[in-house]
């Protein structure tokens, strides 16, 4: 699971802020308790001293038996100090671990990664929140723009020329597939979708619903336009600037490695040889790695076959489920 670099940076920054805030609270409490009970400060200093003595013995060069008199004496003093410390804290109304550095997440110690190098659930949760926030801002989504609030009555129930179903019945079928894809991600039988149809028919709205639902489940989602994708790959290939090259690598990597890529407005770009190669690299690479993709376009599958290479058209036509949108432009009908 690979989140966008900006999403990861914001999540890690929140984790660092959480650690800093906890440390400030611990320090302020420690200062207050030391002021109330000066003996507590001395006990803590003496406890640190016993640990320093043990370290000095270990580094002394001569063998020291674990049950020898030196170790036993230090251990006895340490235990006596701990008992006194517990009693002092209790007298102030606190438990024995009140001043300990206890992380909010015991799995990773509030670092975001477990000892075996895996992303911790606490960091994944923060990434999910940041990803939803970014998608909401990008798509200008409101709280009611999801599958639970989607309305089919805005689509005409009258027959549509050249189609066997009315726009409303067609959208009912389209929504059924999109909702199943999102709610059952990544195990839904259909792995890749092609949302095809004119402007103002709900492709972007449904894409946003899918992005939000898949994000809520903790998967990484990248939503971007075809033009942005091609620009990133072009920069990666031609730039000579080191910083631009690094940023371009991050950009192109996110298109290839995210759990779900939603590519909007395919067909709006200039169809150059580089664009053809780039699109095939992304589509084929994601198919080979088993990652899921949704392509939104004004082009029909027939027009895609005319505009792009046979190899690319074959991959999309054979391994994507085309969902056709038709009807009146809702932006004009409901002004």
Residue ranges and their predicted role:
Residues 1-13, 18-48:
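Short, charge/polar-rich alpha-helical segments
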Residues 93-145:
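Interdomain "pre-motor" coupling segment immediately N-terminal to P-loop NTPase/helicase cores
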Residues 143, 147-193:
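Pre-Walker A (pre-P-loop) alpha-helix and adjacent loop at the N terminus of AAA/AAA+ ATPase modules
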Residues 159-174, 215-257:
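Short glycine-rich substrate-engagement loop in P-loop NTPases that contacts/grips substrate
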Residues 190-206:
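Walker A/P-loop nucleotide-binding motif
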Residues 191, 219-220, 257-260, 289-295:
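Loop/turn-to-beta-strand initiation segments
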Residues 205-218:
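P-loop NTPase Walker A phosphate-binding motif
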């Amino acid at each position: 699971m690979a989140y966008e670099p900006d999403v990861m940076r914001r999540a890690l920054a929140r984790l660092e802020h959480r650690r800093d805030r906890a440390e400030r609270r611990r320090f302020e409490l420690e200062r207050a308790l030391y002021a109330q009970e000066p003996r507590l400060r001395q006990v803590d200093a003496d406890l640190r001293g016993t640990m320093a003595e043990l370290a000095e013995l270990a580094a002394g060069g001569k063998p020291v038996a674990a049950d020898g008199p030196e170790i036993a004496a230090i251990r006895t003093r340490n235990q006596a100090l701990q008992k006194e410390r517990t009693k002092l804290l209790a007298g102030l109304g606190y438990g024995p671990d009140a001043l300990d550095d206890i992380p909010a997440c015991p799995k990773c110690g509030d670092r975001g990664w477990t000892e075996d190098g895996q992303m911790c659930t606490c960091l994944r949760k923060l990434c999910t929140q940041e990803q939803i926030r970014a998608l909401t801002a990008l798509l200008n989504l409101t709280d009611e723009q999801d599958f639970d609030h989607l309305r089919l009555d805005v689509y005409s129930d009258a027959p549509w020329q050249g189609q066997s179903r009315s726009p409303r019945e067609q959208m009912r079928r389209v929504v059924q597939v999109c909702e199943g894809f999102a709610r059952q991600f990544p195990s839904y039988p259909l792995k890749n979708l092609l949302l095809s149809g004119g402007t103002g028919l709900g492709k972007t709205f449904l894409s946003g619903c899918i992005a939000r639902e898949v994000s809520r489940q903790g998967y990484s989602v990248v939503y971007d336009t075809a033009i942005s994708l091609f620009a990133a790959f072009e920069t990666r290939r031609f730039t000579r600037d080191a910083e631009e090259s690094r940023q371009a690598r991050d950009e192109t990597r996110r298109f290839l490695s995210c759990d779900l890529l939603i590519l909007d407005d395919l067909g709006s770009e200039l169809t150059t040889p580089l664009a053809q190669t780039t699109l095939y690299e992304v589509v084929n690479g994601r198919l080979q790695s088993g990652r899921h993709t949704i392509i939104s376009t004004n082009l029909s599958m027939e027009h895609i076959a005319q505009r792009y290479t046979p190899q690319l058209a074959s991959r999309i036509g054979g391994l994507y489920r085309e969902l056709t949108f038709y009807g009146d432009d809702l932006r004009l009908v409901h002004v």
